[in-house]
Amino acid sequence: MKVLLLEDVKNLGKAGEVCEVKDGYGNNFLIANQKAKLATNEVINKYKAEVKKKAEKEALEKAQKLQMVETLQTITLTIHKKVGANGSLFGAITKEEITERLKEQHASLNLDKKDIELKHPIKSTGIYEIEVKLGSGVVGVFKIDVVAE
């Protein structure tokens, strides 16, 4: 019996492969546990179409992320904070605060706090480079300017 694997199966094959298996193993284990489907032309064509659609969707998402990174690199985000006598901020600037200010000043950019990578806490005024990891290997950098109120 030929089956189309829906997920990786140890000692048999990887997802998307068509494998020849014994009837009992195919029916009682693979198909019953939804690890495979009977490999008919219709099932194979449907699976290929789903894979193609998924790849197109991922390519579109990656293109949108790359465009967002290009936009981010042109931005300098300004954050006004109260400063103590020694020049340090009252509290550190957090990822949440950066995303809120970004939404206020640039509404078209919608970043989540988990996308922002802070190497160390921002506790004084100055210009800092903030790294953004958007997934799919897309990484960008933008600047924030911390100014005393």
UniProtKB/Swiss-Prot annotation:
Does this entry carry the keyword Lipid metabolism?
no
Please give one Pfam family short name.
Ribosomal_L9_C
Its signal peptide is none
Instruction: Name the keywords, alphabetized.
Output: Ribonucleoprotein, Ribosomal protein, RNA-binding, rRNA-binding
What GO biological process, any one, is recorded here? Answer: translation
List the GO cellular component terms.
Answer: cytosolic large ribosomal subunit
Superkingdom assignment: Bacteria
Q: What does this protein do?
A: Binds to the 23S rRNA.
Q: Which protein family is named in the record?
A: Belongs to the bacterial ribosomal protein bL9 family.
Task: Name it.
Answer: Large ribosomal subunit protein bL9
Originating species: Helicobacter pylori (strain ATCC 700392 / 26695)
